[in-house]
């Protein structure tokens, strides 16, 4: 949304699905789903409606055209707030185009399967969707299975968790780091 270019967003230029296809072919419901799930967008329905309305007139081909459509769907109060009004929509499109959460899930599982005993896996995330996924996967892998206390079983028969959670809460940038690197404000580090 910073530069006017064709709607693409593919990390792999050989794959078929791009942002242009999503914006111009996804149904209202599909647009709402990705905006809600991947963009955590509050104005999901107005944005999806505005996209549908515009593409009925002519296809939305460029980033600036899409930004204008998004802005037309948002209240003035939101447009005056800090931050770009299209940020969450573009994030949602990028995640959908590249299946970023699927790739993260697969990468986490593969990384954990490769860990040697007492090995560590450290992951830095940059937005809440990624962080929530890492937190949940780490929690799943570091938790012992639930056993009903009424079941007569010896403590030695209970399978322990395969991994130990090193950071219960994420490590975030210090004030000093933030001064040196302003982009680190959203970074969170988790270690298992």
Report the location of each language-model feature.
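S-adenosyl-L-methionine-dependent methyltransferase catalytic core, i.e., the SAM/SAH-binding region
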Residues: 1-192
């Amino acid at each position: 949304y910073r530069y006017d270019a064709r709607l693409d967003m593919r990390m792999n230029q050989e794959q078929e699905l791009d942002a242009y296809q999503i914006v111009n072919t996804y149904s209202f419901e599909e647009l709402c789903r990705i905006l809600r799930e991947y963009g955590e967008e509050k104005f999901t329905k107005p944005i999806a409606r505005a996209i549908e309305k515009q593409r009925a007139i002519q296809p939305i081909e460029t980033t600036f055209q899409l930004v204008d459509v998004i802005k037309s769907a948002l209240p003035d109060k939101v447009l005056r707030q800090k931050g770009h009004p299209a940020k969450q929509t573009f994030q949602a499109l990028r995640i959908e185009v590249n299946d970023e959460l699927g790739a993260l899930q697969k990468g986490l599982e593969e990384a954990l399967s490769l860990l040697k005993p007492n090995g560590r896996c450290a992951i830095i995330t940059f937005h809440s969707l990624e962080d929530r996924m890492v937190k949940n996967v780490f929690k799943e892998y570091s938790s012992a299975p639930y056993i009903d206390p009424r079941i007569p079983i010896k403590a030695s028969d209970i399978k322990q968790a395969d991994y130990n959670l090193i950071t219960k809460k994420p490590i975030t940038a210090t004030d000093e780091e933030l001064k040196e690197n302003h982009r680190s404000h959203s970074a969170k580090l988790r270690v298992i």
